[in-house]
Amino acid sequence: MRTAELLIVLLCGPTLSWAFPDPAFDSRGASLDLGVPKMASPSTDLAAEVADRLWVTAVGPDRESRTLASEAGFAIEEIRGNRMMGAALPETIAALKQAGIEVESAVPLQRRATAKDFPSEDASFHNYAEAGALLRGLVASAPRLASTFSIGRSFLGRDIIALRLNTSAQGTAPSAKPGIAFMATHHAREHLSTEMALLLAQHLVENRAKPEIAALLGSRDIYIIPNINPDGSEYDIEGDRYHMHRKNMRPNGDKSVGVDLNRNYGHHWCETGASDNPRADTYCGSAPFSEPETGSVKTFLEARPNIKVLLAYHTFSELILYPWGYTDAPISEAPALAAYKAMAETMAKMNGYTPQQSSELYTASGDTTDWAWAALGIYSFTFELSPKSLWDGGFYPGVPAIATTFAANLRPALYLIGLADDPLRAPAAGDAVAGAEDRPFHANSGR
């Protein structure tokens, strides 16, 4: 059973104070107390949102209609033929209809039998405290390789923890080695992405003596950040049940909660495929980088010019996405576009996912990968992990999905680590992967 207290946001009252400290991770991850202060329960407004949320199927035959739906606040999680699906509140359904989009069905999610909870069926998933304990254990087992530090704090004061793997630099010390960053859980309900990041960290540390892995670890500066949105992910599992929460935990002026962190980055912020309605799941926030979580990612990446590759794990749909998301136009630099396509197509052969430019689904502005590429020239990908559909488990696919999803996605991760020195060589590099057994893909049964 989970024993850590789960953090809930206090929405009521004229004054809000969130300035409590969470013990920061030091550069070596040594003996840190990850206890979280106990806070008040959420307001009835947020509880009502949980109860009212529905799984909506609407007609979206083309990119333009899907973009229009996203701008109406609809967080599209699945596309099948000319239909788009996702979780929504009744007011979002009304906004879709007002925009001229046909809504075919709306199923109350609270009645779905697929819902599980961390304390029982999904106890193998890691909450915030358990993830921190796992990272501390990795540091203790390999102190000359692994270190941890906080890239910043969440809205409610939790440390956003990074594990660093580098044989010659610890903590925040600079490094000349080619760097790569893996990030997960921008969206609260995407817990499987946290597990993917944790298992990747564990695999690299535990296999550090193998020649192929040792070669990567000795020549790269690797950062793994398992949870960009710790406040939201902790709320999503509060009360021994899932809440289908997507955003962070900032209280908005209308008593709704949260900003979509993957619409809050600064490149073409809040243009296409994002909403300025605070109650919408795709709410872009009050300004670019208004949220401490996205601001922390910005500061972290800007301070490390050696990072050449970024992979952001999301769920679900089994997709490999690359810029641009905000526009239908492709990347203008021909060599870079060729490298992106080569990397995406090579990784798709490894995990069986579908590779494509992000905007092929629908245009969405203000996301991580667009900003990282535009502002810093970092080759950036989004993986929408398994499963493929809500009907296969959606955001809450159960414990068996952890191992199968990691098995499918280890080789792509190692492939990217290997290319971090020069992604432009991808078209000629083939699909050689260091440190991964040559195994067939085993299929598993939202950006």
Give the role of each language-model region:
Residues E5-T15:
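Bacterial N-terminal signal peptides
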Residues W18-R447:
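M14 metallocarboxypeptidase catalytic domain recognition
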